[in-house]
C-alpha cells in the first residue's frame, strides 16, 4: 500500500508482533489482538526506549500477561513514520496510504501469520497523541475491523488544540517571509531539528500534508501566514477529520464498540484534556452507553502517557477476550 508514496519513504516497514506467554504451548488457542500506534515524530523503536525506574511497554505487557492480570492478547506495534514526522494514520496525497496500509495490509497479514481471533469483536487499537488520534478515527472508518479502542491524549477539538499552535507558527514564519516552503527547503538541507521554529513548523507542515494536501501532494496550511486568518476551505478539511465532529457521522460505529477508553493528563500542555472531554461528550450524545466507555483526566501532562498504555491494554484485553 505504501509503494510509490509521494515522499519516497520506505514502503517495506518493520512490524513488531508480541505473543503472550503460553502462545507456543497451546497451539490450538487463538487470541484477541491490540494494535498500538505511535505519536507524531515517533517511530517503532520508541516502544523499547528505556526510562529511569520504568519498564518498556513491551516488558510491562509481558509482565501483565505473565501475572494473569489480564486475558492474554497479541500486541501489534505499527510503524507509520514519514519524512514529515507522521501520517495521522490517514490516506493522503501528501503522505501516502497509511490508513489503507494499516487496515488492508497489516491486519490481514497478522491474521494470516498469527493465531488471532480474526473478528472485529476481538481486535482493538490504541495509541497516544497522534497515535491516539489514529486509534479514534480508524474504528470510526473501519468498524468492520476494530471493535475496541483506547486513546491517550489523542488530537481532537482542533479549534482549540490546533489554533493555539498556529499562533506561534505565524511568528516563526516571519523569518521566512511567511513562506513555509522556504522553511521546509532550509530544514531539508539541515536535516536536523536545530532551530526553535523547527518542531512547530514541521508538525504544522506535516499535519497539513495529512489533512489538507493539494491533489499534487503539496501541503496547504490552513491559515494566511501574514494575517493569521484561517482559510475557510482549507480549515474545513481539518475540521472534517476532527474526532469530535466525526463521532456524529459514525455514531452507529461507535455504539457498536465493545470498549472505548478516552483519557488525557489534566495538565496536558497541548490542551488535549479539552479534546478528550469533548470526544467523551460527543460519544454520550451519540448514544454510546456509559458501561461501554471509560473516560479519565489523570494527574499529569503530555509526557506522562506511557504509563497509561498498560492500563488501557489490560482493559481492552478484558473487553476483547472471547466469552468463556
Where do the protein language model's features map onto the residues?
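Non-catalytic cap/lid and distal C-terminal segments of serine-dependent acyl enzymes
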Residues: 1-324
Amino acid at each position: 500500500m505504501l509503494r510509490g508514496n509521494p515522499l519516497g519513504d520506505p514502503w517495506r516497514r518493520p512490524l513488531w508482533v508480541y505473543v503472550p506467554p503460553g502462545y507456543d504451548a497451546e497451539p490450538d488457542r487463538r487470541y484477541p489482538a491490540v494494535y498500538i500506534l505511535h505519536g507524531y515524530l515517533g517511530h517503532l523503536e520508541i516502544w523499547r526506549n528505556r526510562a529511569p525506574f520504568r519498564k518498556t511497554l513491551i516488558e510491562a505487557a509481558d509482565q501483565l500477561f505473565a501475572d494473569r492480570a489480564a486475558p492474554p492478547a497479541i500486541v501489534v506495534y505499527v510503524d507509520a513514520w514519514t519524512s514529515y514526522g507522521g501520517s495521522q494514520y490517514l490516506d493522503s496525497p501528501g503522505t501516502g496510504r497509511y490508513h489503507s496500509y494499516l487496515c488492508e495490509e497489516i491486519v490481514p497479514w497478522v491474521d494470516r501469520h498469527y493465531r488471532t481471533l480474526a473478528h472485529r469483536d476481538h481486535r482493538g487499537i490504541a495509541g497516544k497523541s497522534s497515535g491516539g488520534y489514529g486509534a479514534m478515527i480508524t474504528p470510526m472508518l473501519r468498524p468492520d475491523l476494530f471493535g475496541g479502542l483506547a486513546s491517550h491524549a489523542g488530537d481532537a477539538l482542533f479549534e482549540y488544540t490546533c489554533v493555539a499552535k498556529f499562533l506561534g507558527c505565524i511568528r516563526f514564519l516571519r523569518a521566512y517571509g511567511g513562506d513555509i516552503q522556504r522553511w521546509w527547503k532550509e530544514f531539508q538541507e539541515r536535516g536536523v531539528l536545530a532551530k526553535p521554529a523547527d518542531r512547530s513548523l514541521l508538525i504544522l507542515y506535516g499535519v497539513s500534508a495529512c489533512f489538507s494536501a493539494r491533489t499534487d501532494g503539496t501541503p496547504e496550511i490552513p491559515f494566511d501566514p501574514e494575517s493569521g486568518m484561517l482559510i475557510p476551505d482549507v480549515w474545513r478539511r481539518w475540521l472534517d477529520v476532527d474526532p469530535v465532529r466525526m463521532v456524529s457521522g459514525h455514531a452507529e460505529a461507535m455504539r457498536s464498540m465493545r470498549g472505548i477508553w478516552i483519557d488525557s493528563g489534566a495538565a496536558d500542555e497541548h490542551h488535549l484534556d479539552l479534546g478528550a472531554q469533548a470526544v467523551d461528550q460527543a460519544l454520550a450524545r451519540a448514544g454510546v452507553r456509559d458501561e461501554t466507555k471509560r473516560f479519565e483526566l489523570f494527574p499529569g501532562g503530555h509526557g506522562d502517557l506511557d504509563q497509561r498504555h498498560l492500563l488501557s491494554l489490560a482493559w481492552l484485553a478484558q473487553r476483547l477476550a472471547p466469552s468463556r
